[in-house]
């Protein structure tokens, strides 16, 4: 059963000179326990589509259905906080917070119980032990920072993980670690993992690949 659906989703925005039809009639159902890759050339609409799935933008036409209800009918802030976890290429860690504090942050926003214990569990789940907890992000490698970002996503308690070019700043070794971790989260932990990528290694490991061209699935 699908946890997230795109139904006839279009997105049009006004550029400096003209209207741009970035996403054109996308229909797709995403399921828990699966690892998806969205691929295509730059400008094909894949990041725009991910932004719509994340609730950062509303579709011009059509709708996104989460757990049986349109996101247009939901509180967008609560949807983004509780339903979706977003992982970016640039990690987006707070530079003055420790590793542990970065993972704690989304739980403090929703006043979660046992937040410290959960943060430690999620850090262990991504392969970071206690020796990392009090470090600042600047003390970590790119791959380690991305693992902290994934741990923070897990701490949000959402079942959908959206990732925009999560291996874009990583070397081959760290890219493989992150890809394997995201795949494991889908197959062993039951998350719905959706990744926008140019990385063919991610596409090769995905359960399903959505190829976009000029805003369409092809």
How would you name each of these model-derived features?
Residues 70-85:
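ABC ATPase NBD coupling module
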Residues 62-71:
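Conserved ABC transporter NBD signature motif
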Residues 114-131:
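Conserved ABC ATPase "signature" region
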